[in-house]
């Protein structure tokens, strides 16, 4: 999919750059694979805002995606590639030989009519899912599991991928987009190829309203508030906040590390925070 530029017929069109979706299916999703979605507006069951900057947006239906790919040794045919409002990647409707339909994340270079299969060991071509331990070293893959049978958790957004860089002690070593290198169990599943829609990051929405259609509300900067409302608030004239960036509740933000799972630290070979080699 390429990028689409628009003529500046209005201020909102000037600079507007969107992904060209002309090659996607234009009909409705499969009803049996969708569910209604109720908007929360960022509120919890008590009506309190628990996640700021959420509200409004176009009505959406949730599409059930097969992240597990545990339907082994049954070949499927890609019926169509669709847009999914719930994620940045495109999705593919697969019809298996036994008649079952399923949505999967569409990888790059997957086209309508292509055959895909999930097996313990399969051909290394986009859309095929297999155990990480059976993939050749150097393979680019996505939708990678962290626990066998749990379903893919790593590399699911547009353009994301993981590269298998080695094997050791019955496990595989993968390199993530962030630069982190870590061990994963060899019996975890992964799907060959990088996720579709890599140009998603190059879009320019052109106007605030287009972001509002996505259900994202504007966020007021802390330095623009009063001291009663934010730790960065107040001061005479424009100020920088006077301290390291914090949330309205005084917790460090913008780069503060929040990882707490020490049990799995031993599986991380190279941290994503390690200095990049020149």
Curated annotation (Swiss-Prot):
A Gene Ontology cellular-component term: large ribosomal subunit
Q: From which residue to which does the signal peptide run?
A: none
Q: Which GO terms describe its biological process?
A: cytoplasmic translation
- Ranges where the record places region Disordered: 29-53, 221-278
Bilayer-crossing regions: none
**Bias regions of kind Basic residues — which residues?**
269-278
**GO MF annotation: an example:** structural constituent of ribosome
Q: List the disulfide bonds.
A: none
Assigned keywords, A-Z: Ribonucleoprotein, Ribosomal protein, RNA-binding, rRNA-binding
> What function is annotated for this protein?
One of the primary rRNA binding proteins. Required for association of the 30S and 50S subunits to form the 70S ribosome, for tRNA binding and peptide bond formation. It has been suggested to have peptidyltransferase activity; this is somewhat controversial. Makes several contacts with the 16S rRNA in the 70S ribosome.
Q: Which family does it belong to?
A: Belongs to the universal ribosomal protein uL2 family.
* Quaternary structure and interacting proteins, as annotated: Part of the 50S ribosomal subunit. Forms a bridge to the 30S subunit in the 70S ribosome.
Identify this protein by name.
Answer: Large ribosomal subunit protein uL2
């Amino acid at each position: 999919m390429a990028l689409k530029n628009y003529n500046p017929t209005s201020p909102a069109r000037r600079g507007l750059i969107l992904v060209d979706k002309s090659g996607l299916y234009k009909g409705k999703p499969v009803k049996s694979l969708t569910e209604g979605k109720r908007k929360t507006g960022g509120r919890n069951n008590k009506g309190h805002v628990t996640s700021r900057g959420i509200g409004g947006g176009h009505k959406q239906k949730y599409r059930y995606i097969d992240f597990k790919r545990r339907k082994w040794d049954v070949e499927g045919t890609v019926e169509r590639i669709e847009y999914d409002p719930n994620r940045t990647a495109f999705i593919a409707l697969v019809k298996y030989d036994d008649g079952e339909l399923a949505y999967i994340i569409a990888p790059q270079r997957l086209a309508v009519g292509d055959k895909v299969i999930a097996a313990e060991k399969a051909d290394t071509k986009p859309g095929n899912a297999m155990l990480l331990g059976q993939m050749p070293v150097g393979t680019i893959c996505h939708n990678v599991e962290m626990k066998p049978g749990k379903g893919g958790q790593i590399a699911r957004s547009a353009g994301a991928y993981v590269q298998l860089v080695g094997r050791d002690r019955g496990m595989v070593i993968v390199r993530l987009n962030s630069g982190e290198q870590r061990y994963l169990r060899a019996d975890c599943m992964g799907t060959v190829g990088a996720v579709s829609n890599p140009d998603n990051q190059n879009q320019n929405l052109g106007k605030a309203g287009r972001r509002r259609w996505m259900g994202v509300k504007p966020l007021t900067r802390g330095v623009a508030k009063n001291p009663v409302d934010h730790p960065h608030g107040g001061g005479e004239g424009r100020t920088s906040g006077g301290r390291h960036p914090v949330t309205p509740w005084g917790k460090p933000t913008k780069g503060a590390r929040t990882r707490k799972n020490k049990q799995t630290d031993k599986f991380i070979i190279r941290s994503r925070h390690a200095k990049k080699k020149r």
